[in-house]
């Protein structure tokens, strides 16, 4: 059973090892090699059983192992490797439906109990036996240019290539970026581009599963014909040092995805009928800005970030993030004991509480079908008897909760302990979302809105 690639992509990026991002901002190659490891757990809250019409109310549990290696070739270049091994288990949603016949808006009342007579929204789920594995592998190189007598500009540029593989999915990608510093390193300009080719081969194909597995693995119409997607992205940014304690930055990006029907979720089928159809392309624009403010007297740094997102599916979102980084350095005059040991070996601790708010509007084709409409759709599928046709949804339509209007809040805490050339890092995050936290359509039904807990722990070692 296919999992939510977009969600996992989003989850993986949030957990990414920090080495590459940090080095990309430097103008001289690091002098030491670095190896890092992260173990992460991601656990979604179950859906209220009263809202589940068919299938399991369990959601995804994801375990992620990440590896990072950086090695200097000389004073001006490094090579890198990043690898990920991920396992997933749980149940996947097919669609959301109204239980009334005409699909009208549900009655807004105070009860949380599912009752068909109140037109509450229900969710059709798969069984809870989904088991998936994913492997990512990327290699890269980065080159550094220092300031010289002939040129005041300094910077770096790099590229990486790799793949992401699952039993039914393969993505090949390349990316490159560069940055240059000017005005005595007060101004930094950056730009980059990436390209990915994804191939989907949904399994099992229609008619190849036995009765025991059928509820967990519905048939896969159209997948053998339309299984390619490309993704092209460009970005540009500028960073400015305002004074010794304040840095601001701004970035913009544009991404275009094309996929005939790959952008459609082939795994959203119910009783043999497709219940998901999306446009053949998706254009996405982002603008982000951030501030880093140091307070030297407190050994503190404040991070504030804002991100605007728009796409031609009708989704518009805003994200605001705030974080406080507090550093504690052990400085002791003791001649012996644990405090003396930590002081002599440069032991330091960093804690970083953070909060984030997010809201988005719904895609123009987001809708919740009525049970009657789904039944009619299934009947049309069976009557047509053509597994290679894609005409049962005559217009774009999806009940994917990621395309609904909602808002989200998350809070987390990071921790870092440094000892000589070793650093232990950990963080956790609690996330909740609902239409009531959003700005538009706050009274809509979204019983499958995402809630999750995530933690990460790992080590970095320089040698």
Predicted feature descriptions by range:
Residues 24-70, 447, 454:
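Short glycine/proline- and aromatic-enriched beta-strand/turn motifs that initiate or cap beta-hairpins
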Residues 39-45, 85-89, 145, 161-167, ...:
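Transmembrane beta-strands of outer-membrane beta-barrel pores
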Residues 47-54, 93-98, 164, 169-177, ...:
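Outer-membrane beta-barrel translocator domains and adjoining extracellular loop/strand segments
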Residues 48, 84-137, 188-247, 252-258, ...:
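Outer-membrane beta-barrel translocator/channel fold
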Residues 58-59, 130-135, 163-174, 281, ...:
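Solvent-exposed loop/turn segments connecting transmembrane beta-strands
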Residues 67-71, 139-143, 176-180, 236-240, ...:
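Residues on the lipid-exposed face of transmembrane beta-strands in outer-membrane beta-barrel proteins
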Residues 77-79, 147-157, 184-189, 245-248, ...:
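Repeated loop/turn-to-beta-strand initiation elements of outer-membrane beta-barrel proteins
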Residues 449-463:
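Outer-membrane beta-barrel "beta-signal"
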